[in-house]
Design a protein with these regions (language model features):
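Sec-dependent N-terminal signal peptides
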Residues: 4-12
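N-terminal small/polar-rich segments of proteins
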Residues: 20-108, 138-171
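Short beta-strand and strand-turn-strand segments in soluble, beta-rich domains
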Residues: 123-132
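Sec/Tat signal peptide C-region and signal peptidase I cleavage site
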Residues: 14-20
């Protein structure tokens, strides 16, 4: 019995110390292709911050259209798209309706709101319709501006409450 136990312990010790060598290969790949970069933004968490559409400061009533243009968070200029490759690249930009879906700025201290619109041209004739893609084309290696202009209609009626009015658009 002692011989059997000794033999079992020797075999068990041998099995524990036995190592098997396994070799193989892993393929490693990279494909670099035509791509585009968006300029004029900063990243905050996992969200790009493209800039601010700042209509400035006014009294509770105003007679003229208030206008603004998005100033890039990174450069102070327009958002831009630059693509590499040899062919022109089409891309689209859509802008949502903001936090209340109707493009209104809300007073941070009351329920008062001010309606606004956003456009892709300085004349404010080409409206960014809510969630409707606008097409742009970029030429190889050249930055294509993605302008965002804003307008607020005159308010000659009931004065708006004093305070800050804010909204956030997703582009």
């Amino acid at each position: 019995m002692q011989k059997s136990l000794l033999a079992a312990l020797i075999v068990a010790g041998y099995a524990v110390n036995t190592q098997a060598a396994v070799t193989g290969q892993v393929d490693v790949k990279l494909n670099i292709s035509t791509g585009c970069t968006v300029g004029g933004s900063q990243t905050e968490g996992n969200m790009n911050k493209f800039g601010t559409l700042d209509f400035g400061k006014t009294s509770g009533t105003w007679n003229n259209v208030l206008t603004a243009e998005v100033a890039s968070a990174a450069t102070g200029g327009n958002i831009s798209v630059t693509c590499d490759g040899t062919d022109p690249v089409d891309f689209t930009v859509a802008i949502d309706g903001g936090e209340r879906t109707d493009r209104t700025l809300k007073n941070t201290a009351s329920a008062d709101v001010v309606a606004y619109n956003v456009y892709r041209d300085a004349a404010r004739t080409n409206l960014y319709v809510v969630n409707q893609p606008q097409q742009f084309t970029t030429v190889s290696g050249q930055a294509t501006a993605v302008p965002i202009f804003g307008a607020i209609a005159p308010n000659t009626g009931t004065p708006k409450a004093q305070g800050d009015y804010k909204d956030t658009l997703l582009v």
